[in-house]
Amino acid sequence: NGEMEHRRYFDINNYKRLSENEMSESEAKRLLKNCFQKSICRQLKSDVRLGCQLSGGIDSSLITAFAVKAQKASPLDTFSVIINHLDFSEEKYSDLVCEKLQTNQHKFTLSNDEVIQYFEDVIWHLDSMNNHPNAMGFYWLTKNAADYVKVKLSGEGADELMGGYVQ
């Protein structure tokens, strides 16, 4: 109708918060596991081949484990980016997860030359000069994984949900 109205769309204080006495820790764990499992199963419904982005961290390892359990058919494709020049690498953890879950593991090494070669592409895809620390690795992994799958499940955003980034 061409008119503008100013009103509050969302207020987090309108939602009931559970007190610690309303749900036991074991019930909360059971509920979270059930929600997580349902979410993964929903994401696996696809008419194209899919896989999991696997860093070796807790979030992507859990997603991969639940996906393997739910998929059952053929080995699940997992994709990891390896950055050799970092002081810390989670490669050994992604290797352990893949071995334990018997996934079809794909690892892609990101060199300094590739960082330089694809830097402009990454900035273009970000649509901003505000670079995210994982942007280059995520770009490199996605670029290479596209040869195998059309969809990747990832743990991106899980730290915000699960209380990560404590430091």
Model segments located where?
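Non-catalytic substrate-recognition/targeting regions of SAM-dependent transferases
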Residues: N1-I12
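ATP-dependent adenylate-handling active sites, centered on carboxylate activation for C-N bond formation
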Residues: N14-Q167
